[in-house]
From Swiss-Prot:
Residue numbers bearing the Phosphoserine modification: 12, 16
Protein's cellular compartments: Cell membrane; Apical cell membrane
Natural source organism: Bubalus bubalis (Domestic water buffalo)
Domain STAS: 563-714
Protein's name in the database: Sulfate transporter
Enzymatic reactions: oxalate(in) + sulfate(out) = oxalate(out) + sulfate(in); sulfate(out) + 2 chloride(in) = sulfate(in) + 2 chloride(out); oxalate(out) + 2 chloride(in) = oxalate(in) + 2 chloride(out); bromide(in) + chloride(out) = bromide(out) + chloride(in)
Family statement drawn from the similarity comment of this UniProt entry: Belongs to the SLC26A/SulP transporter (TC 2.A.53) family.
Sugar-bearing residue positions: 194
Role: Sulfate transporter which mediates sulfate uptake into chondrocytes in order to maintain adequate sulfation of proteoglycans which is needed for cartilage development. Mediates electroneutral anion exchange of sulfate ions for oxalate ions, sulfate and oxalate ions for chloride and/or hydroxyl ions and chloride ions for bromide, iodide and nitrate ions.
One annotated GO biological process: sulfate transmembrane transport
Membrane-topology annotation of the record: Multi-pass membrane protein
Amino acid sequence: MSLKNEEQNDLSPKDSVKGNDQYRAPSGIHLEREEESRNDFWQFEPSNLFRHPRIHLEPQEKSDNNFKKFVIKKLEKSCQCSSTKAKNTIFGFLPVLQWLPKYDLKKNILGDVMSGLIVGILLVPQSIAYSLLAGQEPIYGLYTSFFASLIYFILGTSRHISVGIFGILCLMIGEVVDRELYIAGYDAVHAASNESSLVNQMPDKTCDRSCYAIIVGSTVTFVAGVYQVAMGFFQVGFVSVYLSDALLGGFVTGASFTILTSQVKYLLGLSLPRSAGVGSLITTWIHVFRNIHKTNICDLITSLLCLLVLLPTKELNERFKSKLKAPIPVELFVVVAATLASHFGKLNEKYGTSIAGHIPTGFMPPEAPDWNLIPRVAIDAIAIAIIGFAITVSLSEMFAKKHGYTVKANQEMYAIGFCNIIPSFFHCFTTSAALAKTLVKESTGCQTQVSGVMTALVLLLVLLVIAPLFFSLQKSVLGVITIVNLRGALCKFKDLPQMWRISRMDTVIWFVTMLSSALISTEIGLLTGVCFSMFCVILRTQKPKASLLGLVEDSEVFESMSAYKNLQAKSGIKIFRFVAPLYYVNKEYFKSVLYKKTLNPVLVKAAQRKAAKRKIKRETVTPSGIQDEVSVQLSHDPLEFHTIVIDCSAIQFLDTAGIHTLKEVRRDYEAIGIQVLLAQCNPSVRTPGRGEYCKKDEENLLFYSVYEAMTFAEDSQNQKETYVPNGPNFSSD
């Protein structure tokens, strides 16, 4: 054994004199000079008596953070004019130019063609059905899916996501469309009573109701696309981090109830005004039950038959998706069968069923959005833009991670933004990625974005040739297709027990967002969910977990004594961990929980002062014959510990209030003879702490590990016990 090891063993706690591991307050302290009872622990400099040398790190030189220089440097980099710079800019904005020349035809073409055809077949009935949800004619849903698939092929970086119509966005578009139709006077029920107030708001009479509806829808889509491109340009994609999985899940489920409610009138064949605004779900159900006696029996029977076919087949597709090479396109079969039955059975003429009506072929001339509508729909477009890009970016990143490639979040925002801006000139409404169709696309062998071109070709065939054949298709069939596609969101309730076990807070966020989205409105529900989530984040840091730590045997690791067994508590030392940032919100909680788990220095100090007042007075006669009063302070009971080590590893940052709190805690404890050490401080805590918490010559109060702080506390206590004499100290005035 080396001499160094022998010295360390000689000074180990096991061999120390009894009582050296606990702090015992000096018994003799002058009453009138209580401030001298404070122990300047920082004065115990490292010496050869300490077992472990202190760690000293030299910080990196701080870079020049001059904002003006930073902006100039960025502008110089962005404004460089060269062929390489121009090429990189173009290739970065149009990713298709990068990957298409490298396309492996033999390896990828079969999977891309198969997946594109299947998704296209599924999109035909869904596009027609979701058009009703958006308050549009069926042809506009086909336009939307066609242009979105084609544009994302050019601008997108994800190989697997399917961009097209999404039910939640269609619902939000439909609510804006209904409101603007009512304001413009197209609602015959309310037009007469509001005639005087609508004189200046009526659109050109050459534009009928469906024409004005798509003008409103395309205008909202244009504004939402501009927002998304702006977010990509200014790189504010961080907004999506406030939309947690629990929040998005609750929002989608709540909005699904609203979608389901809006489709009930089609299932029953009722002609009802579409409710919008706060409480629309409840209002719609009231209208349904008031008019239930007007149910069209033919539509009801058709709806039930379609449900009996669609639901079991969808379940079979889900259960046997690993064995099926492609999902059964049951929706297309149902649409074809229902159209044939309606046409040859003359259901519209005989029973008055509601049908899709004329669907034109080809494309309409492009038309600019209504610029006068933009101020009225600008606020509505914000929520639509955020939901659209959040879902698109999250899905693209999820599938990229699954298949081992990378996507550019900002480019995805550009892509989805232009998937809305460009189609808005071609009578389209808002699009985004959709999970259900993306899963189908992936499972059927999709390899690259070429799959989107095949989907667009299928839709183009329908637009040019097949669309008029859906004239006799009942709207009840489209309503059933919409409702059946909501089953994934509505089945989220079965995941709640597992979510509750994992995180109760996330479950509460899910419920609050779901209920507010369903019972109030989709926009207010989203806002409520975001605000409540942020409140929960603050709540988690306001009263975070805090615990005393113990040493794991035969290691230098410390863990919570309330969570693990067989941990060693070091005599005379309390190690405290606070699992949250220390800032103005939780500074009082930090003090209260620290005092509760150790001791309250304010109360101890008060007790010491109270005991000090009980002093022994005795009169003595000096040699000069003058009486003098000598005060003697009674020795206090020794405290259980002499050091508190605060583990700062989980404290991400400090604000001014947090620094003042640490200074106050240190001052209070040192007033009763207990030193406070900080350990495992990250740079964001250590840098402000070094300047505010302690002076320059007190930097040895900050440690890089809890174990280092513990050994310093033991050694400094041993050194102090060596130099501080025991026994009462009588001081006379």
